[in-house]
Amino acid sequence: MIYRRLGRTDLNVSLLSLGTGGARRFGQATDMTLIDQQALLHHAIDLGVNLIDTAEQYGESESILGRCLRGIPRNQYFLSTKWSPRIGEEFVPDPVALQASVERSLKRLGTDYIDIMFFHGPRVAEYGAVVDQLYPVLDALRNAGKIRSVGLSTPFVYDPAQEVARIALTENPAMWDVVMLKYGILNQHAANHILTLADRYDVGVMNMAAVRIKLPNPVLLEELIR
């Protein structure tokens, strides 16, 4: 396995990570048993994967991970999770809800700290409120030792050019330790500005859903290659 320092953080992460979202949500959609979920997670760790990503919005993924990770030394893996400032389609920048969400995530994951806490997919028009009203909550939690790094993930379905990340790294690069982007064959917008800015300011980059849709499906993969 290849490892890299994730931006300015002190996290030396595996090039490949294990995600628990998408349509399957770590086997929730396919009725995978806890034994099989544990086997999958342990196999990934045995292969050298040490970065595991989840979110409160991924059904029971955090709780499942918490059970699967029992008995594995905490220094063998890094955890990233996310909180969305949305209720349905409504943007609700509630600092109290964010604080409560982090506490719930800690309890479900069975850990004293989260390595990377992301804002989950805020849109361009919402970015200012995230910075002014919500970021101070995560900054305080970082100072308290409950999170180690603060990140921003992009809502690429609503913002294919991922302008929110460009704005974040242009206006407030020192605030963001990590950004999570969608980058691949069919969406290379990040190469225009965002990756250059991330490199300039030593901001870590995580690529979401790198193999989730096309590569596991031979038919879609063949169509993509054609």
Predicted region positions:
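A short, structured active-site edge motif that brings together acidic residues
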Residues: N75-E89, F119, L181
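Active-site groove signature of glycoside hydrolases
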Residues: L106-A125
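A structural motif
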Residues: V49, T111-I114, I147, W176
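N-terminal binding-site loop/beta-alpha segment at the start of enzyme catalytic domains
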Residues: M1-Y77, V137, N143
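Short, acidic/polar
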Residues: T30-A44, F91-G110, Y158-T170
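Conserved, mostly hydrophobic/aromatic
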Residues: L6, L18, A44, I52, ...
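Beta/alpha (TIM)-barrel catalytic core signal, keyed to glycine-rich beta->alpha loops juxtaposed to Asp/Glu
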Residues: P122-R226
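Active-site mouth loops of central-metabolism enzymes
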Residues: G22-I35, W83-Q99, G121-A129, V157-D159, ...
